[in-house]
C-alpha cells in the first residue's frame, strides 16, 4: 500500500481541477511579471571591458557575436575554487547546450561567465562536454560592477552571508569541499542570469536575476517538481561524472 494518500479517479479529478485554478492564476501573474520585465529601462554600459575567451580577447560588444541580444549565466567558479565550478551551477550549465541553436536563430547569443582564469574554464568545459562559449571575467571588474561577485568587504555588509559563515549548515560545508575553497571565498560568487541588448553600436544592460530566484535553478529542478515524490529542501548537487553510484 502506498504511503501517500490514495483516492478514486473522481477524487483525483476534483483535486486536479482545484490545482489547475491555482496554476492558471500563477500563469496570469507570470505574464504580468514578464510584461514588467520587458518594460524595465535599459542602462547604457559606458565602461569598456575586455574579456578572456577561447578565441582570445573580446569586448562586451564582441561577445554578442553579431546578434542584438546577449544572455549569460554566471557560473560560480571563482579563482579560489580548486576543484571546479559549483555542482549546482554545473547542473544548470549541463542543460544549456541543446538550446544554443534555438536561441541563436532568435537573435540571442547565449554564453556563460566565470571569474576563474580562462585556461581553467576551457579545461572544465571540455570535461563537462559543454558547447556554449565560456568567458572569463578574471582580468576585469565586470563581475563586481554587475553584482555577479562580491568582495569580502561587500560580503560583510550582507547579514545573510554573515549568518551562513557564522553557523554554516552541513550541506554548505559539503558544498565548500566540493568546490575546493574556503567558505568565505566560495560565497563571493553570485549565481545569476544577466541580459544585454545592442542597438546602433551601443550596449545596454537590461536585466539581472540572482539566486534564490527559481529561474537560477537547473531546469531539472522544475521537472522534479512534477514527479510524485517531494525532493529534499537542500538536495546535494553532483557533477555528472562524480555521482557516488
Which positions does each model-derived feature cover?
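Residues at the C-termini of beta-strands that transition into short coil/loop
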Residues: 114, 136-138
Amino acid at each position: 500500500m502506498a504511503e501517500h494518500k490514495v483516492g478514486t479517479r473522481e477524487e483525483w479529478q476534483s483535486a486536479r481541477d482545484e490545482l489547475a485554478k491555482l496554476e492558471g492564476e500563477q500563469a496570469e501573474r507570470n505574464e504580468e511579471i514578464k510584461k514588467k520585465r520587458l518594460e524595465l529601462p535599459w542602462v547604457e554600459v559606458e565602461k569598456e571591458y575586455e574579456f578572456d575567451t577561447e578565441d582570445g580577447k573580446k569586448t562586451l560588444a564582441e561577445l554578442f557575436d553579431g546578434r542584438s541580444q546577449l544572455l549569460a549565466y554566471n557560473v560560480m567558479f571563482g579563482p579560489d575554487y580548486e576543484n571546479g565550478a559549483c555542482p549546482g551551477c554545473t547542473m544548470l550549465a549541463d542543460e544549456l547546450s541543446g538550446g544554443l541553436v534555438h536561441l541563436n536563430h532568435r537573435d540571442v547569443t547565449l554564453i556563460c561567465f566565470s571569474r576563474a582564469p580562462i585556461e581553467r574554464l576551457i579545461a572544465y568545459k571540455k570535461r563537462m562536454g559543454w558547447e556554449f562559449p565560456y568567458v572569463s571575467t578574471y582580468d576585469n571588474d565586470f563581475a563586481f560592477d554587475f553584482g555577479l561577485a562580491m568582495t569580502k568587504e561587500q560580503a560583510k555588509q550582507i547579514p545573510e552571508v554573515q549568518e551562513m559563515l557564522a553557523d554554516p549548515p552541513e550541506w554548505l560545508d559539503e558544498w565548500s569541499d566540493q568546490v575546493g575553497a574556503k567558505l568565505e571565498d566560495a560565497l563571493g560568487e553570485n549565481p545569476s542570469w544577466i541580459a544585454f541588448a545592442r542597438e546602433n553600436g551601443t550596449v545596454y544592460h537590461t536585466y539581472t536575476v540572482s539566486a534564490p530566484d527559481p529561474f537560477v535553478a537547473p531546469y531539472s529542478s522544475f521537472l522534479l517538481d512534477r514527479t510524485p515524490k517531494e525532493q529534499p529542501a537542500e538536495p546535494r548537487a553532483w557533477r555528472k561524472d562524480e555521482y557516488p553510484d
